[in-house]
Amino acid sequence: ARSYGYDKLHFYQGDIAGYEGVSSVDMVVTLHACDTATDFALAKAVEWGAQVILSVPCCQHELNGQMQREGAGYDKLAPILDYGLLKERFAALLTDGLRAKYLEQSGYETQVLEFIDMEHTPKNILLRAVKTNQAKQGSESQVWECRKFLGIDPMLGVLLDKGTES
């Protein structure tokens, strides 16, 4: 970055969960941070007040493991949740949808976009969030109802302390 004159652009490699090297940033970019590593990166971006967040999530296993047969909404979604492949894909989409909603709750205008054709990679979802400092109305109740219905507790909600009904 320095060789191109970007002296304020920094790249860091390591475990984001415990990283404490900065107090604020302009932009956070994540690419294929596996499972809850994406959640830790998004939580740090919110904590640092990043003006822009660009995140391409990778594998999303957390909610797949949390959706159990005892969940309140399991019977209604049995046509999807009874089949491993469908449950895995549903959990991945649900994870990214909830991440988008948590970012909206945190004052970001958020979009979920396809950033590359499916023929190149099935992991082609981009979460694009721009800070507005205005929480989107209704997103908290939507997330709460979804969590209650499926009996899930997403990591990003825990990290952002959005784990209870408001």
Give the positions of each predicted feature.
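Class I S-adenosyl-L-methionine
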Residues: 1-166
